[in-house]
């Protein structure tokens, strides 16, 4: 591998721009369909767009702030000395593959990926397990670096530090590289988007792409007639299953009567009273229009409906 660019004095915007030039570790899981928070469809649109999206949230902020702590704890637990990479790296054999390592381990052909996670996700790290999209990320780093192994240190908030070692598997890396390069060749280069996979993140991406409708335009969807039939079939099945599910819930309620709780082997059931206060918006608009207008805001969205014409 080679150092593509130093990150010591690189701005966040330029760092993001460099990452558009190839496939990074965090792209790997999304391209493989393993990332629950990001999809291949999103990766594609990020790569072809000139827009630099500096996305951030509290979880990402905490992950950055605690990276030093996780690396320090890893060194304490293993005795290995680590150092910052301070660069975006590029595979010499597969130039499309880029990587931004958290840490490199001094004196070894190995690296370290630092993670933080909720205690509610602790089971995903138990018994040697690693969330699939993180494992894909580490395999990507092994592919770029050519190293023998990579470590993942995950801080489970308030619970424990989990350390896993991933050893290079040449067949796994070969398959990963093939899929990443095919994604780039088949989609990014010709600018042909991959099919969305039904996740919420793809819905958000599509809604962002086409926020405004053209009321004077009607699209010909004849080519999708088979898909529309399939959707209708699925909708009918879901409706039937929802009714069956509700009927079961009704039987359970009849059995519980006024009991707040119920038990069965493997199940705990609750049917408890609760109270909530809601604003009567119609009355507020009628009796206090100034206050209603003061705290109201216009929200623009496109409503999507499909009507089956029998």
Per-segment meaning from a language model:
Residues 1-310:
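Accessory terminal regions of nucleic-acid processing enzymes
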């Amino acid at each position: 591998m080679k150092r593509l660019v130093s990150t010591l004095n690189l701005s966040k915007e330029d760092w993001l721009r460099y990452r558009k030039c190839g496939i990074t570790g965090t792209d790997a899981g999304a391209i493989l369909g393993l990332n629950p928070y990001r999809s291949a469809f999103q990766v594609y649109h990020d790569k072809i767009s000139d827009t630099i999206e500096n996305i951030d949230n509290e979880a990402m902020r905490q992950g950055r702030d605690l990276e030093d702590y996780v690396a320090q704890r890893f060194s304490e637990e293993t005795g290995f000395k680590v150092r910052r990479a301070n660069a975006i790296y590029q595979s010499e054999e597969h130039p499309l593959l880029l990587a931004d390592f958290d840490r490199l381990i001094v004196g070894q052909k190995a690296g370290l990926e630092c993670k933080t996670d909720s205690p509610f996700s602790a089971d995903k790290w138990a018994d040697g397990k690693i969330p699939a999209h993180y494992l894909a990320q580490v395999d990507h780093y092994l592919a770029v670096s050519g190293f023998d192994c990579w470590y993942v240190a995950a801080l489970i908030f308030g619970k424990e530090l989990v350390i896993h070692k991933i050893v290079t598997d040449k067949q796994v890396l070969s398959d990963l590289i093939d899929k990443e390069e095919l994604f780039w060749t088949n989609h990014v280069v010709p600018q042909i988007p991959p099919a969305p996979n039904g996740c919420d993140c793809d819905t958000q991406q599509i809604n962002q792409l086409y926020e405004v409708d053209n009321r004077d335009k009607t699209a010909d969807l004849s080519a999708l007639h088979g898909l529309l039939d399939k959707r209708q079939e699925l909708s009918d099945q879901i409706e039937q299953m929802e009714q069956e599910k509700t009927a079961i819930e009704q039987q359970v309620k009849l059995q519980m009567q006024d009991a707040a709780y119920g038990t069965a082997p493997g199940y705990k059931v609750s049917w408890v009273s609760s109270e909530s206060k809601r604003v009567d918006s119609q009355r507020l608009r009628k009796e206090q229009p100034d206050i209603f207008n003061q705290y109201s805001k216009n929200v623009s969205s496109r409503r999507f409906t499909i009507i089956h014409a029998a």
